[in-house]
């Protein structure tokens, strides 16, 4: 019974990866729109996009880390 609860909890913890995927899509979609509107700001917008990607990916990695902790440690 405990093993089943671990697996269910791990599956629920990985749903945080959905938000990270959506966030990364929004960041790079906005980068494409911004560059198409003003190509002269490409380097500055790209730097902001990489920063947004890093923050979004970090939340996804935290969710994945929690899932692994629930599965293997708890």
Swiss-Prot record:
Site (Reversibly protonated during proton transport): 57
Keyword flag Transmembrane: yes
Keywords for the protein's UniProt record, in alphabetical order: CF(0), Hydrogen ion transport, Ion transport, Lipid-binding, Membrane, Mitochondrion, Mitochondrion inner membrane, Transmembrane, Transmembrane helix, Transport
Stretches that traverse the bilayer: 16-36, 50-70
GO biological process: proton motive force-driven ATP synthesis
Topology in the lipid bilayer: Multi-pass membrane protein
A Pfam short name: ATP-synt_C
Entry-linked PROSITE patterns: ATPASE_C (PS00605)
Single GO molecular function: proton-transporting ATP synthase activity, rotational mechanism
InterPro entries, alphabetized: ATP_synth_F0_csu (IPR000454), ATP_synth_F0_csu_DDCD_BS (IPR020537), ATP_synth_F0_csu_sf (IPR038662), ATPase_proteolipid_c-like_dom (IPR002379), F/V-ATP_Csub_sf (IPR035921)
Location in or out of the cell: Mitochondrion inner membrane
GO CC annotation: mitochondrial inner membrane; proton-transporting ATP synthase complex; proton-transporting two-sector ATPase complex, proton-transporting domain
Protein family per UniProt: Belongs to the ATPase C chain family.
Protein purpose: Mitochondrial membrane ATP synthase (F(1)F(0) ATP synthase or Complex V) produces ATP from ADP in the presence of a proton gradient across the membrane which is generated by electron transport complexes of the respiratory chain. F-type ATPases consist of two structural domains, F(1) - containing the extramembraneous catalytic core and F(0) - containing the membrane proton channel, linked together by a central stalk and a peripheral stalk. During catalysis, ATP synthesis in the catalytic domain of F(1) is coupled via a rotary mechanism of the central stalk subunits to proton translocation.
Quaternary context: F-type ATPases have 2 components, CF(1) - the catalytic core - and CF(0) - the membrane proton channel. CF(1) has five subunits: alpha(3), beta(3), gamma(1), delta(1), epsilon(1). CF(0) has three main subunits: a, b and c.
Protein name: ATP synthase subunit 9, mitochondrial
Originating species: Neurospora crassa (strain ATCC 24698 / 74-OR23-1A / CBS 708.71 / DSM 1257 / FGSC 987)
